[in-house]
């Protein structure tokens, strides 16, 4: 039997990362990229990678010429910030395969990486500085350790039915940093924090789910779709759009060593629910909303004809980029009732070394609760 059963098709090059695919320009952290081939190579091979939209060399590759030995099919390399502090606006940079030495190879995907300008911490007012001193005297609570750029570790567990839909794996864990300040709602008696950049370390995760709910949704991107008409009308360009998130009203309860952080917020249907009051902003949505506010119209396809439609009416119809699709149901009790339950009780705690949160979270096309657990290390 001399039949050769070895795979002779295209050897696809797949890239992935389990790290947070977003960096601040000042970050020392690297994004580790895993390379996986469909099948092992017969001879030693080299794959070269490159970064698009990387003017001024904002990012750099470490070992970007990846060598794969005969008989192997995996490799990894790193992407780092050059830490030049040049950016004024967020930038999306695309990592792609440049070339390769094995003619059977073919790129399977690209990776989108986000680089944010260095977050700046607003100066506290004199009154806020007094509050912080007061918390030390009143509660023996050094709030300075909770503020500034604070490092965290995040663990995300998806509902079982969402694996293959919203995520390739059931759990993910990654490192991040949040920029935290004293909330304008803090008082002399009530220490309240506000996360002004990368709240809970999950901005990239929220942006990924938002894209899957909207611009990457297969029901959006077909020929003649009103969604496509909307994106053309606003000049949608993913590499230039900015998606940002803020989280206010994280109140420390010093006597208990806990946080109160769940509060009323509005969902897609303008119903008040109990959840984390994330405040989302997205540049493409701002432009679409402005067109509606100014009474704008666009041409859309109805059957075989192009007709003029008011942007306000289209938004009413659900042709929208509003990030409120990331707000769905109350998390103070189990509204999904999946078997087994994927709900966890929302909790926030702090001690001398760390502060941590756990909470269930869902979005419009969820199939249950995603469980999010975040642990911050207090600044020294």
Predicted regions and their residues:
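Acidic/polar, low-complexity intrinsically disordered N-terminal segments immediately downstream
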Residues: 1-160, 379
């Amino acid at each position: 039997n001399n039949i050769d059963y070895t795979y002779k098709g295209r050897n696809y090059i797949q890239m992935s990362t389990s790290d947070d695919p977003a960096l601040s320009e000042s970050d020392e952290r690297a994004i580790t990229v895993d390379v996986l081939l469909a099948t092992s190579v017969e001879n030693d091979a080299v794959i070269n990678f490159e970064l698009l939209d990387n003017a001024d060399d904002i990012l750099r590759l470490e070992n970007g010429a990846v060598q794969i030995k005969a008989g192997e099919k995996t490799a990894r390399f790193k992407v780092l910030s050059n830490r030049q502090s040049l950016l004024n606006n967020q930038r999306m940079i695309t990592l792609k395969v440049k070339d390769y030495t094995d003619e059977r190879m073919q790129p399977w995907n690209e990776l989108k990486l986000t680089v944010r300008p260095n977050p700046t911490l607003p100066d506290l007012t004199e009154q806020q500085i007094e509050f912080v001193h007061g918390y030390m005297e009143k509660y023996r609570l050094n709030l300075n350790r909770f503020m500034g750029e604070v490092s965290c570790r995040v663990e995300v567990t998806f509902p079982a039915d969402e694996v293959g839909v919203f995520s390739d794996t059931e759990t993910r864990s990654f490192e991040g940093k949040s920029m935290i300040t004293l909330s304008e709602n803090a008082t002399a008696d009530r220490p309240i924090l506000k996360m002004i950049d990368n709240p809970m370390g999950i901005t990239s995760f929220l942006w990924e789910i938002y894209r899957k709910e909207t611009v990457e949704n297969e029901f959006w991107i077909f020929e003649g779709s009103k969604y496509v008409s909307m994106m053309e009308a606003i000049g949608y360009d993913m590499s230039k759009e900015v998606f940002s998130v803020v989280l206010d009203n994280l109140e420390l309860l010093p006597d208990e060593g806990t946080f109160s952080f769940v509060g009323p917020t509005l969902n897609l249907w303008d119903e008040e629910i109990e959840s984390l009051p994330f405040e989302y902003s997205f540049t493409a949505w701002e432009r679409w909303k402005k067109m509606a506010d100014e009474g704008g119209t666009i041409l859309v396809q109805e059957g075989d004809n192009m007709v003029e439609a008011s942007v306000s009416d289209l938004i009413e119809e659900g042709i929208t980029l509003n990030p409120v699709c990331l707000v769905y149901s109350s998390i103070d009790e189990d509204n999904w009732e999946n078997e087994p339950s994927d709900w966890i009780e929302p909790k926030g705690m702090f001690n001398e070394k760390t502060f941590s949160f756990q909470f269930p979270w869902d979005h419009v096309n969820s199939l249950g609760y995603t469980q999010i657990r975040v642990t911050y290390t207090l600044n020294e």
